[in-house]
Amino acid sequence: LMAYSLMYTIQKYWVNKRRRTQILEKRIAEERQQLDTISVKVMDSMVHALGAKIPGEEEHYLGVAAFAREIALREGMDEQQCADAYSAGLLHEIGMIGIPDALIRREDLSDEEYKVFQTYVPKGYQIITTLHSTGRSEIADAVHYHREAYDGNGFLEGLAGEKIPKLARVLAVADYADRHLRRGESPMLVARLILEQQNRLFEPQSARIMAQMLQEYEVSI
């Protein structure tokens, strides 16, 4: 009887402990979700502020986000990855918040000025990792590595091929496409330029999908 009573007491202790742990984990998850909601609102406000700082840029971010999500979808990525691709597109230049206006507006930058300008990439990574509380790194990594080139001649770290995070490879071609379209270049021309840069600037799969999307758009207009 004593052994049974002891076993019952132990089982009751572990059941109660498990319940307390579950309650605590639920509270932590709820708090993280609340923090993420706040973080998303903060980053959304920063995107709007950056759009006001650089005329036309907010539309560019939305365009890149839409392209990145569609590429991810066509590559068979899951719902979360597609959502991450969209978020990365919105935030890929968020680090511009920390760059002087004079450097953003000028095109004839000196080597030293261009080095300062390039810091928008790590600044963006730092902003996203600071505000995003769940520990998921896909969006931050996509932003951090989206200026890498598929052949290893990009920046910041000179990564090449599969070493570049997948969403960064998607983001690179989405950014290029939207940027060139906003210069007034035709979808067919941009598609051709992208295909010419396969294995150099862009991953072939993402490049072909982006080119196909542009060709479809050209036919539809």
Segments predicted by a language model, with ranges:
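Metal-dependent catalytic cores of enzymes that make or break cyclic nucleotides
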Residues: 51-221
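Polar low-complexity intrinsically disordered regions
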Residues: 1-2, 221
